[in-house]
Curated annotation (Swiss-Prot):
The active site is at 22 (nucleophile). In the C-terminal section; belongs to the purine/pyrimidine phosphoribosyltransferase family. Pathway: Purine metabolism; IMP biosynthesis via de novo pathway; N(1)-(5-phospho-D-ribosyl)glycinamide from 5-phospho-alpha-D-ribose 1-diphosphate: step 1/2. Residues 1-21 form a propeptide. Its EC number is 2.4.2.14. One of its GO terms (biological process) is 'de novo' IMP biosynthetic process. The keyword Protein transport does not apply. This is Amidophosphoribosyltransferase. It catalyses: 5-phospho-beta-D-ribosylamine + L-glutamate + diphosphate = 5-phospho-alpha-D-ribose 1-diphosphate + L-glutamine + H2O. Keywords: Glutamine amidotransferase, Glycosyltransferase, Purine biosynthesis, Transferase.
């Protein structure tokens, strides 16, 4: 296999936002498979900016390109795409939540099996990945990366089933957590989604060839047709037959569970033009802002979004409240990201590199700042300072999601619980004082549910994954202090 390398550069990073782990894209049977995969990954760049990789197969051998950095930094080069021939391809954009930032962790990961090679790309996180890794190492396995995705390759290799498809299914039956996953062999493209449906995965079609990707925006960029969402717990096996036709076999190997898609796909992660779970993301975010205005009104002169995530919600807030909307903060979209762990001091400095106050829209006014979420509060603090320096008379923060109390273990890069702003202060008033705002309010959990799904949260059977707000984890967390960790956190939430 070919493998290309490049090296990371250090760029400023805002460490007060949540980050999704990955985006995946795969296509089977198309002569321009790698080029289409690169375009799909470009549309999914928001899901991971640390690294991107593509694997292809041309009927004889597998080819691989893996690079640190953005998709456009490498895969717009015709020479790079020329090194990825073939009609089968999968690709991956990465933001690490498990495993260090290193070339050996850049996906897709590849392994040679007795019946041929297999490559895997994975979005999400396995909550028993570390436990399984320790088990396979104890029995003689040698791991080449620190990514939890590699565990799947080992389980596939150890499976006693005859076909690669059955080996793959045998492996994912042992995995717990939230994931969407693509695998490719010499003739197959396999898609899988976790039994709870925490991470999204969609199926599309271009020129009669099947496509799987994290979001519909990756279908739109190449003019592909959306077919349907991959169902929770579903495995879809697409295979090129000897006559050139493509067979599609959909299976449900896991015990059916109620789907609980991650709410943060709507709050922050998914691109606004994507359709996730049958819902336009932009519309749900605008609904969040409208509900926020109903729940937490304030006398003000202007509604200003914290770009870019807060923009749809700010539009909704302005529409519902009747307060004019203005771009009072301008974002620099050309500030890069870092591949080192930044200090809090560097994090705070990075805010001004990304955001500038538009004084003409702010000076002398009472400002409502609308953001999608608050994690540590460091960004909010600096933005409030910036808005006051630009002459705002009052600054009121409205957040289009509930307070975050609990860490995530399903593919979102969240701090430890004690680093979250909501756990550092006794009440919202104390948080507002820390940030320097005249007032602070968060959208209620029911307000969020109504914005996305049209009805209140069902506490007996929540319609979405919302553990970061409620402590109600949808699966056990075997790697985190044993099987009872999820129940303990849920009890903490109910007692809080």
């Amino acid at each position: 296999m070919n493998q290309s390398h490049s090296f990371p550069t250090d760029d400023p990073l805002d460490g007060d936002t949540l980050h999704e782990e990955c985006g995946v894209f795969g296509i089977l049977g198309h002569p321009d498979a790698a080029a289409l995969t690169a375009l799909g990954l470009h549309a999914l760049q928001h899901r991971g900016q640390e690294a991107a990789g593509i694997v292809s197969f041309d009927g004889k051998r597998f080819y691989q390109e893996r690079h640190m950095g953005l998709v456009g930094d490498h895969y717009t080069n015709p020479m790079t795409l020329a090194r990825l021939p073939g009609s089968i391809s999968i690709g991956h954009t990465r933001y690490s939540t498990t495993g260090e930032v290193a070339m050996r962790n850049v996906q897709p990961l590849f392994a040679e099996l007795e019946e041929g090679g297999i490559a895997i790309a994975h979005n999400g996180n396995f909550t028993n990945g570390l436990t399984l890794r320790r088990q396979i190492i104890a029995t003689g396995a040698i791991c080449q990366s620190t990514s939890d995705t590699e565990v799947v390759l080992h389980l596939i290799a150890r499976s006693r089933h005859a076909s690669t498809s059955d080996r793959f299914i045998d492996a994912i039956r042992q995995m717990e957590g939230g994931y969407s996953m693509l695998a490719m062999t010499r003739t197959k493209l396999i898609a899988a989604r976790d039994p709870t449906g925490i991470r999204p995965l969609v199926m599309g079609e271009l020129d009669g060839k099947p496509i799987f990707c994290s979001e519909t925006c990756a279908l739109d960029i190449i003019g592909a047709k959306f077919i349907r969402d991959v169902e929770n717990g579903e495995v879809i096996i697409c295979e090129i037959q000897p006559d050139g036709s493509i067979s599609i076999d959909a299976r449900k190997p896991s015990k059916p569970q109620p789907e609980r898609l991650c709410l943060f796909e709507y709050v922050y992660f998914a691109r606004p033009d994507s359709v996730v779970g049958g819902r336009n993301v932009y519309t749900t975010r605008k609904n969040m802002g409208m509900n926020l205005a109903k729940e937490s009104p304030v006398d003000a002169d202007v509604v200003v979004p914290v770009p870019d995530g807060g923009t749809p919600a700010a539009l909704g807030y302005a529409q519902e409240s009747g307060i004019p909307f203005e771009y009072g903060i301008i974002r620099n979209h050309y500030v890069g990201r870092t591949f080192i762990e930044p200090t809090q001091q560097i994090r705070a400095f990075g805010v001004k590199l990304k955001h500038s106050a538009n004084r003409a829209m702010i000076e002398g006014k009472r400002v409502v700042l609308v953001d999608d979420s608050i994690v540590r509060g460091t960004t909010s603090l600096k933005i409030v300072q910036m808005i006051r320096e630009a002459g705002a008379r009052e600054v009121h923060i409205r957040v289009a999601s509930p307070m975050i109390f609990f860490p995530d273990f399903y593919g979102i890069d969240t701090p430890d619980a004690d680093k979250l702003l909501a756990n550092q202060y006794a009440d919202v008033e104390a948080m507002a004082k820390y940030i320097g705002a005249d007032s602070l309010a968060f959208l209620s959990i029911n307000g969020l549910y109504r914005a996305v799904g049209g009805e209140d949260r069902n506490p007996a059977r929540p319609q979405f994954t919302d553990h970061y707000f409620t402590g109600d984890y949808p699966t056990r967390l075997l790697d985190k202090n044993g099987e009872s960790m999820g129940n303990k956190l849920s009890m903490l939430a109910s007692n809080g």
